[in-house]
């Protein structure tokens, strides 16, 4: 059995899934695992724009290295990602460069964010999520490491993991995703 502490309550479970995104490495380190996980950190800023500008809902400027999306009289601009530690200081160099490029083509008004928003996405060394049984602990399962596409891929891997937990045939070949592909 596993005892999980949630706020001031504790719950006991037969099985537990570690699906804690960028915090998975920290959780599993306490259990003796050395997960080859890094963090893709991406930044974005919000700006107001003039009301009379008609823009596409989203543009990906490959050469400029940014994406912007519009919502009413606001625009959000995102930069590429950096590989860094989850708790590393903000590195605004990339997003600031992107903002300068965007100012050349769009009349940005007020910056609506004081500092850029920062998201840390868990990235396994081989770029594949880790899905399956924990190699050292009974009834412990992994489902994390979905890189910057976790919002769209983690639910599908959850279905696959549920099948694994129930000893059902999975809809995909799970071998490339198994945790034991690494010496943890």
Language-model-detected regions and their locations in the chain:
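C-terminal lid/capping helical subdomain adjacent to the catalytic/cofactor pocket in oxidative enzymes
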Residues: 134-184
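Short linear sequence motifs
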Residues: 6, 36-37, 170, 175
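Active-site substrate-recognition segment that forms the wall
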Residues: 10-138
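Generic recognition of long tandem-repeat/solenoid scaffolds
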Residues: 3-5, 77, 143
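Conserved beta-strand-loop-beta-strand element in the redox core of flavoprotein oxidoreductases
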Residues: 1-11
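Short, flexible active-site loop motifs that bind/organize anionic cofactors or intermediates
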Residues: 6, 85, 148
